[in-house]
Amino acid sequence: MDYAMKSLSLLYPRSLSRHVAVSTAVVTQQLVSEPSRETPRARPCRVSTADRKVRKGIMAHSLEDLLGKVQDILKLKDKPFSLVLEEDGTIVETEEYFQALPRDTVFMVLQKGQKWKSPSEQRKKKAQLSLSQKPTKKIDVARVTFDLYKLNPQDFIGCLNVKATLYDTYSLSYDLHCYRAKRIVKEMLRWTLFSMQATGHMLLGTSSYMQQFLDATEEEQPSKAKASLLPACLKMLQ
């Protein structure tokens, strides 16, 4: 009997409406409190420098988080900088715009005095700098190379190859084969002896010629003296 009365009390409209109201309040409280507990998910993005030489991957929850990580990674503490889109140079200043961007967006860090430039402009500027710094092309008129090598390990000097190139078009080479050390010494002594003999013959010929010249001058002087004494003696006799 008591069990039946309790069942009827549960089915009473007031208790039923009260139970539904409490359940609705709990569900509403959960739905309201859940969004407040949610935090923005970390979004992958990439950051590059103004010259596009350095590119880093960063996970950031918000624009403020991204700015702080960029400052730490690129060591920009106490240095003013701004973030722009790498593709077109649009400035990223608000959180709403940052959240509206797709994942893996590439940002560019611009420091004070730097401006956004397209990749084509940067390539053009690099090409101009390389052309201005490139040295003028020089044309070789003549080039001579010497190559010393040995055909036999016992060779003293070996062989010498001389190669000459004119205007990078015409070339001429010559191989000079040297003899062994003994043959080189013999040839040197032979040429030395020949030069000494030739020098001796020259000295002998020169000395004989000088002797003949001196003898001839000495013979002329007495004859002239005798010819000058005859007129003087004749005058004295008269």
Curated annotation (Swiss-Prot):
Matches recorded under SUPFAM superfamilies: CAD & PB1 domains
Compartment(s): Lipid droplet; Endoplasmic reticulum; Nucleus
InterPro entries: CIDE-N_dom
Family: Belongs to the CIDE family.
One annotated Gene Ontology cellular component of this protein: lipid droplet
Origin superkingdom: Eukaryota
Up-regulation conditions: Down-regulated upon hypertonic conditions.
Gene3D superfamilies assigned to the protein according to its UniProt record, in alphabetical order: 3.10.20.10
Biological-process GO terms, alphabetical: apoptotic process; execution phase of apoptosis; lipid droplet fusion; lipid droplet organization; lipid storage; negative regulation of lipid catabolic process; negative regulation of triglyceride metabolic process; regulation of apoptotic process
Domain comment in the entry: The CIDE-N domain is involved in homodimerization which is crucial for its function in promoting lipid exchange and transfer.
Keyword terms of this UniProt record: Activator, Apoptosis, Endoplasmic reticulum, Lipid droplet, Lipid transport, Nucleus, Transcription, Transcription regulation, Transport, Ubl conjugation
Chief localization: other
Domain CIDE-N: 41-118
Molecular function as annotated in GO: lipid transfer activity; molecular condensate scaffold activity; phosphatidic acid binding; phosphatidylinositol binding; phosphatidylserine binding
Residues covered by region (Required for liquid-liquid phase separation (LLPS)): 1-35
Assembly behavior: Homodimer. Interacts with CIDEA. Homooligomer; undergoes liquid-liquid phase separation (LLPS) via its N-terminus, facilitating lipid droplet fusion, occurs at the lipid droplet contact sites. Interacts with PLIN1. Interacts with NFAT5; this interaction is direct and retains NFAT5 in the cytoplasm. Interacts with CEBPB. Interacts with isoform CLSTN3beta of CLSTN3; inhibiting the lipid transferase activity of CIDEC.
PTM (free text): Ubiquitinated and targeted to proteasomal degradation, resulting in a short half-life (about 15 minutes in 3T3-L1 cells). Protein stability depends on triaclyglycerol synthesis, fatty acid availability and lipid droplet formation.
Gene source species: Rattus norvegicus
Protein name from the UniProt record: Lipid transferase CIDEC
Pfam family, one: CIDE-N
